[in-house]
Amino acid sequence: MELYEQTIHNLQTQLQARQVSSVEITNSFLDRIESTDQSINAFITVTKEQALLDAAAADQRIAAGNCAPLTGIPVALKDIFLTEGVRTTSASKMLDNFIAPYDATAWTRMKSQGAVLLGKLNQDEFAMGSSCENSAFGPTRNPWNKDHIPGGSSGGSAAAIAAQQAVATLGTDTGGSIRQPASHCGCVGLKPTYGRVSRYGVIAYASSLDQVGPMTRDVTDAALLLGVIAGYDPKDSTSVDCPVPDYTAALQQGVKGLTIGLPKEYFIDGLDADVQQAMEQAIAVYRQLGAEFVEVSLPHTNYAVATYYLIATAEASSNLARYEGVRFGHRAKDTAGLIDLMMQSRSEGFGAEVKRRIMLGTYALSSGYYDAYYIKAQKVRTLIQQDFNEAFRSVDLLLTPVAPTPAFRIGEKTADPLQMYLSDIFTIPVNLAGICGISVPAGISSNGLPIGLQLLGRPFGEETILRAAFDFEQATQWHTKKAAL
């Protein structure tokens, strides 16, 4: 097995035993990126020289007996995380040449534990999209079938795992942007509880919905990474001050005796036949493992997409007001005064989908429509949260599909924004409720594309969904399937 095919925990063991060096591992991934990324387009920036310097320094620390959980492990970040001295674009022309002056907290924590940065990953511009087609740097392609999308907005983060260009990546999840691409690319994607991981240094899309999480090859690595990045951060006012458990220790507990809820609103007519079959097979596996199932109802699910696209766009309208060509960001040339400068800079700097969402959000917040749209959406959001609270009174976790279909073809939905938005119908409610969710590989479609299973837990119930995901992973081995590049 090549070094680039392995997991964090396997590489850790070899590094600590001095069987391999971090420089060798890092070179293996850099060579893999060089040989495969022209056809995948997962990376916006590759930090080759710095990565090799950091890997050499990691080898020195290992030789001195100073080995942290991620020492010498090469990782990559969605290009929405600020990285000091490294270009951070959020896949937008607006930030094409922006060099961050400080690190995001999540990356600071990974770096403090010895991680080596391979580079920054492609995404939908400002995390607005479900297909990774809305990037100023071109679309990312799914390594399983390059005519298909990898999912979004963390499409590069998922594609890099599937193409074996990185052992682990970080993404962000605002309406499914970790879980949906993980499902489409056959990897593990964890969206933690809102407030579990600091958002400091993450370019904001919708501040009440955004959450940082890991994308990995298996559940053990996801648990390990979450343990590194989770925890209170005084720099993030939404960060929650509660203890961080040892997530890897809970993995072996299994699901025997757990009650799993099946939300009837998620198993609907129109669900792709391959997805339906994968869910039925997953339920059968869990029954064999000793879990019990009950049907539950989340009655306001049908309102989730509309609610999300009012709240998220309203917050985006506010967050993206700072990009006006004066303080930072793209600055238009040959303009007639300040107002024209701002208008031209934003017109040139933002892509079509970002402009669409800014306009939707500005409209929802405008005088005369604020109560009718934004306030009403916040009230429905509360009802969706209450639906989940009620469901968790009788179950330990929920099992659902991640997406209604496997990955669709590039360009298939770009002309129909509503159809694109509806592809996140099973992931959006989780962000509105602020709970945790994980996508794990659960099958392969008839046309050879991965299908993911979604497990949802109570707020700060990551241990439960991780142990359930691990039990399923060990019983099925879907996570060992690899894209043929």
Curated annotation (Swiss-Prot):
Which GO BP terms, alphabetically?
translation
Provide one Gene Ontology cellular component: glutamyl-tRNA(Gln) amidotransferase complex
Thylakoid found in the keyword field? no
Q: Which GO terms describe its molecular function?
A: ATP binding; glutaminyl-tRNA synthase (glutamine-hydrolyzing) activity
The active-site annotation reads K78 (charge relay system), S153 (charge relay system), S177 (acyl-ester intermediate)
Which Gene3D superfamilies does the protein's record reference?
Amidase signature (AS) domain (3.90.1300.10)
Q: What does this protein do?
A: Allows the formation of correctly charged Gln-tRNA(Gln) through the transamidation of misacylated Glu-tRNA(Gln) in organisms which lack glutaminyl-tRNA synthetase. The reaction takes place in the presence of glutamine and ATP through an activated gamma-phospho-Glu-tRNA(Gln).
Subunit-structure text: Heterotrimer of A, B and C subunits.
Q: Which NCBIfam families match?
A: gatA
Instruction: Give the family from UniProt.
Output: Belongs to the amidase family. GatA subfamily.
* Protein name in the entry: Glutamyl-tRNA(Gln) amidotransferase subunit A
- Identify the species of origin: Trichlorobacter lovleyi (strain ATCC BAA-1151 / DSM 17278 / SZ) (Geobacter lovleyi)
Lineage of origin? Bacteria, Pseudomonadati, Thermodesulfobacteriota, Desulfuromonadia, Geobacterales
GN (gene name): gatA
